[in-house]
Protein backbone atom coordinates (compact mmCIF):
# COMPACT_ATOMS: atom_id res chain seq x y z
CA UNK A 1 0.00 0.00 0.00
CA UNK A 2 1.06 3.56 -0.64
CA UNK A 3 1.04 6.48 1.79
CA UNK A 4 1.73 10.15 1.44
CA UNK A 5 4.11 11.46 4.11
CA UNK A 6 3.24 14.96 5.30
CA UNK A 7 -0.29 15.22 6.70
CA UNK A 8 -0.76 11.44 6.79
CA UNK A 9 2.19 10.19 8.86
CA UNK A 10 3.48 13.43 10.35
CA UNK A 11 2.00 16.79 11.24
CA UNK A 12 2.17 19.64 8.75
CA UNK A 13 2.23 23.35 9.44
CA UNK A 14 -0.65 25.04 7.62
CA UNK A 15 -0.23 28.65 6.53
CA UNK A 16 -3.20 30.06 4.67
CA UNK A 17 -4.58 27.11 2.73
CA UNK A 18 -1.21 25.44 2.19
CA UNK A 19 0.37 22.66 4.26
CA UNK A 20 4.14 22.71 4.76
CA UNK A 21 6.39 19.83 5.80
CA UNK A 22 8.68 19.97 8.82
CA UNK A 23 11.79 22.08 8.20
CA UNK A 24 14.05 19.95 10.39
CA UNK A 25 14.15 16.48 11.88
CA UNK A 26 13.47 18.05 15.29
CA UNK A 27 10.14 19.40 13.97
CA UNK A 28 8.84 15.97 12.91
CA UNK A 29 5.77 15.00 14.92
CA UNK A 30 4.20 11.65 14.13
CA UNK A 31 0.43 11.99 14.14
CA UNK A 32 -1.63 10.22 16.83
CA UNK A 33 -2.58 6.66 15.98
CA UNK A 34 -0.14 6.32 13.09
CA UNK A 35 2.12 3.64 14.64
CA UNK A 36 -0.86 1.45 15.61
CA UNK A 37 -2.53 1.89 12.22
CA UNK A 38 0.66 0.90 10.40
CA UNK A 39 1.18 -2.08 12.73
CA UNK A 40 -2.32 -3.33 11.87
CA UNK A 41 -1.68 -2.97 8.14
CA UNK A 42 1.74 -4.60 8.38
CA UNK A 43 0.21 -7.51 10.32
CA UNK A 44 -1.95 -8.19 7.24
CA UNK A 45 1.20 -8.46 5.14
CA UNK A 46 0.86 -5.15 3.33
CA UNK A 47 4.07 -3.47 2.19
CA UNK A 48 4.20 0.11 3.47
CA UNK A 49 5.54 2.42 0.77
CA UNK A 50 5.69 6.20 1.19
CA UNK A 51 5.41 8.37 -1.94
CA UNK A 52 6.03 12.04 -1.22
CA UNK A 53 6.42 15.26 -3.20
CA UNK A 54 9.17 17.43 -1.73
CA UNK A 55 9.28 20.46 -4.07
CA UNK A 56 10.96 22.71 -1.50
CA UNK A 57 14.24 21.10 -2.56
CA UNK A 58 13.80 22.38 -6.14
CA UNK A 59 12.63 25.73 -4.76
CA UNK A 60 15.81 26.05 -2.69
CA UNK A 61 14.00 26.36 0.65
CA UNK A 62 14.93 22.86 1.86
CA UNK A 63 17.91 20.58 1.37
CA UNK A 64 17.70 17.07 0.03
CA UNK A 65 19.82 15.99 3.01
CA UNK A 66 17.19 17.13 5.54
CA UNK A 67 14.35 15.52 3.55
CA UNK A 68 16.29 12.25 3.47
CA UNK A 69 17.02 12.49 7.23
CA UNK A 70 13.29 12.85 7.87
CA UNK A 71 12.51 9.96 5.52
CA UNK A 72 15.07 7.71 7.20
CA UNK A 73 13.74 8.63 10.65
CA UNK A 74 10.18 7.74 9.61
CA UNK A 75 11.35 4.49 8.02
CA UNK A 76 13.09 3.44 11.24
CA UNK A 77 10.44 4.69 13.65
CA UNK A 78 7.41 3.45 11.72
CA UNK A 79 8.96 0.41 10.02
CA UNK A 80 8.24 1.75 6.53
CA UNK A 81 9.47 -0.55 3.76
CA UNK A 82 10.51 2.18 1.30
CA UNK A 83 10.22 5.90 0.62
CA UNK A 84 10.04 7.37 -2.87
CA UNK A 85 10.46 11.14 -3.04
CA UNK A 86 10.02 13.55 -5.93
CA UNK A 87 12.22 16.61 -5.52
CA UNK A 88 10.83 18.46 -8.56
CA UNK A 89 8.62 21.55 -8.62
CA UNK A 90 5.29 21.98 -10.43
CA UNK A 91 6.82 23.31 -13.64
CA UNK A 92 9.51 20.64 -14.01
CA UNK A 93 7.20 18.27 -15.95
CA UNK A 94 8.66 15.10 -14.47
CA UNK A 95 6.92 11.72 -14.41
CA UNK A 96 7.34 11.25 -10.66
CA UNK A 97 5.56 14.26 -9.17
CA UNK A 98 2.05 13.52 -7.98
CA UNK A 99 -0.61 13.79 -9.42
CA UNK A 100 1.32 11.74 -11.98
CA UNK A 101 1.64 8.07 -10.96
CA UNK A 102 5.37 7.67 -11.64
CA UNK A 103 6.49 7.03 -8.05
CA UNK A 104 3.75 4.44 -7.52
CA UNK A 105 4.55 2.69 -10.80
CA UNK A 106 8.26 2.58 -9.99
CA UNK A 107 7.65 1.29 -6.46
CA UNK A 108 5.20 -1.34 -7.73
CA UNK A 109 7.76 -2.53 -10.27
CA UNK A 110 10.62 -2.62 -7.76
CA UNK A 111 8.59 -4.33 -5.02
CA UNK A 112 6.39 -6.63 -7.10
CA UNK A 113 3.17 -4.88 -6.08
CA UNK A 114 -0.10 -5.40 -7.95
CA UNK A 115 -1.45 -1.86 -8.25
CA UNK A 116 -5.00 -3.08 -8.85
CA UNK A 117 -4.92 -4.67 -5.39
CA UNK A 118 -3.32 -1.66 -3.69
CA UNK A 119 -4.41 1.41 -1.79
CA UNK A 120 -3.17 5.00 -1.92
CA UNK A 121 -3.74 7.12 1.21
CA UNK A 122 -3.11 10.85 0.98
CA UNK A 123 -4.26 14.21 2.27
CA UNK A 124 -4.33 16.17 -1.00
CA UNK A 125 -6.07 15.86 -4.32
CA UNK A 126 -2.78 15.03 -6.08
CA UNK A 127 -2.34 11.93 -3.93
CA UNK A 128 -5.79 10.70 -4.91
CA UNK A 129 -5.21 11.50 -8.59
CA UNK A 130 -1.87 9.64 -8.59
CA UNK A 131 -3.41 6.62 -6.90
CA UNK A 132 -6.34 6.55 -9.31
CA UNK A 133 -4.03 6.92 -12.34
CA UNK A 134 -1.99 3.97 -11.05
CA UNK A 135 -5.12 1.85 -10.62
CA UNK A 136 -5.20 1.86 -6.80
CA UNK A 137 -8.18 2.19 -4.50
CA UNK A 138 -7.88 5.72 -3.09
CA UNK A 139 -8.42 7.11 0.39
CA UNK A 140 -8.38 10.82 1.16
CA UNK A 141 -7.48 11.97 4.66
CA UNK A 142 -9.81 14.95 4.43
CA UNK A 143 -8.13 18.15 5.57
CA UNK A 144 -9.19 21.80 5.05
CA UNK A 145 -6.44 22.09 2.40
CA UNK A 146 -7.22 18.81 0.57
CA UNK A 147 -9.04 20.47 -2.36
CA UNK A 148 -11.60 17.65 -2.50
CA UNK A 149 -13.40 19.32 -5.40
CA UNK A 150 -10.43 18.39 -7.60
CA UNK A 151 -10.65 14.63 -6.98
CA UNK A 152 -13.00 11.72 -6.42
CA UNK A 153 -11.51 9.41 -3.80
CA UNK A 154 -13.00 6.00 -3.20
CA UNK A 155 -13.12 6.80 0.53
CA UNK A 156 -12.81 9.91 2.73
CA UNK A 157 -11.52 9.56 6.29
CA UNK A 158 -10.39 11.75 9.18
CA UNK A 159 -6.96 10.18 9.73
CA UNK A 160 -4.74 7.16 9.09
CA UNK A 161 -6.44 5.15 11.85
CA UNK A 162 -9.72 5.44 10.01
CA UNK A 163 -7.99 4.69 6.69
CA UNK A 164 -6.52 1.51 8.18
CA UNK A 165 -10.01 0.46 9.31
CA UNK A 166 -11.32 0.99 5.77
CA UNK A 167 -8.43 -0.98 4.25
CA UNK A 168 -8.77 -3.87 6.68
CA UNK A 169 -12.51 -4.01 6.05
CA UNK A 170 -11.94 -3.96 2.27
CA UNK A 171 -9.37 -6.74 2.58
CA UNK A 172 -11.86 -8.84 4.55
CA UNK A 173 -14.64 -8.15 2.02
CA UNK A 174 -12.63 -8.92 -1.08
CA UNK A 175 -10.22 -11.62 0.04
CA UNK A 176 -7.28 -9.43 -0.98
CA UNK A 177 -3.94 -10.33 0.67
Positions of the model-derived regions?
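Residue-level marker of alpha-helix boundaries and capping positions
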Residues: 28, 61, 118-119
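Substrate-recognition element of Asp-dependent hydrolases with the DxDx(T/V) motif
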Residues: 34-71, 80-92, 131
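Active-site neighborhood of HAD-like aspartate-dependent phosphohydrolases
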Residues: 1-49
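Residue-level signal for short segments within beta-strands and strand-turn junctions
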Residues: 11-13, 87, 142
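A short acidic, helix-capping loop that chelates divalent metal ions and anchors anionic groups
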Residues: 18-21, 56-60, 90-94, 147-150
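Anionic group-transfer/hydrolysis microenvironments
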Residues: 6, 55, 100
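Asp-based, Mg2+/Mn2+-dependent phosphohydrolase catalytic module
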Residues: 65-82, 91-120, 124-177
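Residues that scaffold the ATP/ADP-binding catalytic core of kinase and kinase-like folds
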Residues: 12, 60, 166
